[in-house]
């Protein structure tokens, strides 16, 4: 499994909004400058996030985007699944409703299941609030 640029940038975009969660809208242009990602590409990503109800769009001269909820209410897993779809490494562990006909006799199923559980466990345990805190700690520790 490889996370696409879209998924990585969606997490960065949401983190940027969380870092600038002051009650005022943040423009795509400002996010683009800070993240080094084209505003056109960010507009495509923010559209997906907006349709899913993750962000609120504010129109007008002082317009931009804001998180709809508190940063602690978004996990990295939520953002990645929205932009990437399933994070399962193989199809046989992709859906709980799907029963693999070889599951009982397939030793490798155990590997894929453990890998899937590990991936989901990690991305579902990290919130935007966690990332904000980590980013602030990294910034505090950065000394020239």
Which residues are covered by each model-predicted region?
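Beta-hairpin "wing" of winged helix-turn-helix
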Residues: 54-62, 66-67
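Short, hydrophobic-biased segments on the C-terminal half of alpha helices
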Residues: 46-47
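Alpha-helical residues within the helix-turn-helix
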Residues: 33, 50-51
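C-terminal regulatory/oligomerization modules of transcriptional regulators
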Residues: 76, 94-144
